[in-house]
Amino acid sequence: MKNLYLLLCLPFVALFFSCSTDVDLYANYREVPIIYGLLDARADTNFIKITRAFYAEGDATLSAPNPDSSNYPGKLDARLVEYCNGDSIREIILDTVTIYNKQQGVFYAPAQKLYYTTEPLPNNSKTQKYSYKLKVALPDRLLTTHADLVGNDSYDVQSLAVNFSKEYFNTVPREFLFRPAINAGFYEVDMTFTFLEQRTPDGDSVPRTMHWYIGRLNDFDLSSNMDMNCYLFYYRPEDFYAKLQEFIGGDTAIAGLKRYITDYPVEVIITAGGEELRQYVHNNDPSLGFSQGDNAFSLIDGGYGVFSSRMTARRRVRLGGETVPELVAMRNWGFKFIGGREDHQ
């Protein structure tokens, strides 16, 4: 299952072959401009990847995994035009930076040239809705694309606890509330469960975190089943136990092993993605590359890729109901509740 965490990083997914810095090697190849950018009003820096690849007539294999061919020379004129309720407010000129912590992938690594801005982006409100046009001047064309800004100050997680009590096994799913984000096309929901693990009596307690992907939820569907002014997602307690059993390695008791549960062990993470991103994910299989035969979906006028927006809401919550005593009762799992205490001896 595709996780939004990966989608929101959005590497250009395609098949590549070796290439040389010799430009003549690309004489028979057509240049493909590519843009990936997701604006986030809660981020202190927003990055946009502006790059290119090459392919030949009838050849679905793209080339350009090294910086000499993938990067456009110099610094392009790239800017964001900010709109409020449809009126142009300001232009933000993007600067460039090279990052050196990119993991190995289809593009060259570890260094990547990115365009960025540290200009604060305003939040949407009931009376003011923001959007952005990205304009990139290439030597032979102008790339343009548009995105509505996702999110607002009130977008957040509402419920204060999750309840994995066994009395709800194989019954109706449990519900969890959050406030919607303006201009969101969909949401992806994750939970994490963190506990301390001590494998020997004199050993250190090491944090361990189980990640649980709940799913992708369409804004249109959520809006048709609201609780007051909140959206709801659902989870099943039996799925939590199954995930946790797999994560800790089964039911077999390990001599001397202890696991400690604190007051707020679960974090709920809800990421809202823009409508442009929803359309891109819906229309493109990220495992495929672009070719003339693919007719790949793109909202970039003059290029490929996606330009959209996102915002993440998160909250640490308690374990409700009988969840804690029931976990402690699973003796082979070795759990003990310590609340907010640092001393768990």
Predicted regions and their residues:
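Sec-dependent N-terminal signal peptides
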Residues: 6-10
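C-terminal motif of bacterial Sec signal peptides marking the signal peptidase cleavage site
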Residues: 15-18
